[in-house]
Amino acid sequence: MTYVFPETIAAQATPSGRGGIGVVRVSGEKTKAIAQKILGCVPKPRYATFVKFRDSGSVIDEGIALYFPKPNSFTGEDVLELHGHGGPVVMDRLLNTVLKAGARQARPGEFSERAFLNNKIDLAQAEAVADLINASSEQAARSAMRSLQGEFSKRIHQLVDALIQLRMYIEASIDFPEEEIDFLADERIKETLENLTHQVQEIEKTAKQGALLREGITVVIAGEPNVGKSSLLNLLSGQETAIVTDIAGTTRDIIRESIHIDGLPIHVVDTAGLRLTEDVVEKEGVRRTQKAVQQADLLLLMIDASKPTEDFKKIIAQWFSENDNKIPTLIVENKIDLIGEAPRKENKEYPHIKLSVKTRAGVELLKNHLKNTAGFEATHENNFIARRRHCDAIARASAFLKNANNHLLNQKAGELVAEDLKLAQNALSEITGEFTSDDLLGKIFSEFCIGK
């Protein structure tokens, strides 16, 4: 069944700016009437038709029109796409003509929202549309495409169906107590519940990988002036992002650069050198450094390996006495080329990596540590893209299933087991949108671009 929305919507579906082609998309009950006004006809469904786009008889542009009648369209409504020349003036005139003919400007994500409400895609697939557009690596794009094609949703639906079947079986033992069968003592219930718990734990691991592909981790490089922080940023990013000189205090502000290591997005933050200073600008840089550190997933505390050992022990002790030591920290001992040491990793109170940014010795050790800290598996080919809300929902489902196991094995409490299964089912159904609040839907679709 197609949901009938009272308003027809329109938006430019291609990015703003100059381009060879620009597309205006229309969806809703007035689509055919709008086509008749602007094109003088309703194009043959699913055929590219070359036409002139007119406003009150005056030709605005000429190009290709594509018409998709309901319900076999992206939104499930009548959809019209007008492909014209991609100049901003032309696109503005064409969109304004469509709006004047009876449509209104679409909100961000409103086309995808209508597709979801008309059961053309589920919520996880709708989110995958945005994730595919925003993918920052080839691996993220492939994973988003798998989600868009429904692989993630299929696994969630299979789990939900299995939970429903098990819950029905357990509820039967509650509703028909006169039957002389102890359903809860049935070994198959125990095995099924254990199997479902394991499956949810496995999909939780995969979802975490998908969330890492989408969001990555934030790594902050901090330390005293002139220890090689900016040089490390330049080395990791592969370009001269930060100015590097022998003068202490060159970096006075936060410098951010996004890189990829085997598909893992890493947001690297280079910071001002930490030292006592009377310079007002440098003081502000130090303050921003301390703020950036609090938002880090991993801190790289850089020190100069060529200095006496007691000096950098004092630096490390002072740092952790003044800052939150709950943030995962790696001590990076740079400039080992000056003292003739080989690169290596040491696991002390805090892990240490000895390297030389100048010679690149030990840099692979650092990259591997970044991936391991994030829990990233670069060779995981069956990843789907995931969001934090997906991970949260799966984690809640996993917790409910653990409760169900406890209630089954230790208390033989059928009612509690059934309730745990229902809660796990609802948590998983939030992912595909079958059990979702309107507030969450509004938040999700508001993050889309206009025209999608």
Swiss-Prot record:
Its main location: cytoplasm. It holds the Pfam family MMR_HSR1. K(+) binds at residues 226, 245, 247, 250. SUPFAM superfamilies: P-loop containing nucleoside triphosphate hydrolases, TrmE connector domain. Binds 1 potassium ion per subunit. Keywords: Cytoplasm, GTP-binding, Hydrolase, Magnesium, Metal-binding, Nucleotide-binding, Potassium, tRNA processing. (6S)-5-formyl-5,6,7,8-tetrahydrofolate binds at residues 25, 81, 120, 452. It is found in: Cytoplasm. GO terms for cellular component: cytoplasm; cytosol. Signal peptide: none annotated. Residues 216-375 form the TrmE-type G domain. The keyword DNA repair does not apply. It is an enzyme of class 3 (hydrolase). The keyword Hydrolase applies. Mg(2+) binds at residues 230, 251. GTP binds at residues 226-231, 245-251, 270-273. Its cofactor is K(+). One of its GO terms (biological process) is tRNA wobble uridine modification. GO terms for molecular function: GTP binding; GTPase activity; metal ion binding. NCBIfam families: mnmE_trmE_thdF, PRK05291.1-3, small_GTP. Belongs to the TRAFAC class TrmE-Era-EngA-EngB-Septin-like GTPase superfamily. TrmE GTPase family. Homodimer. Heterotetramer of two MnmE and two MnmG subunits. This is tRNA modification GTPase MnmE. It comes from Coxiella burnetii (strain RSA 493 / Nine Mile phase I). The lineage of its organism: Bacteria, Pseudomonadati, Pseudomonadota, Gammaproteobacteria, Legionellales.
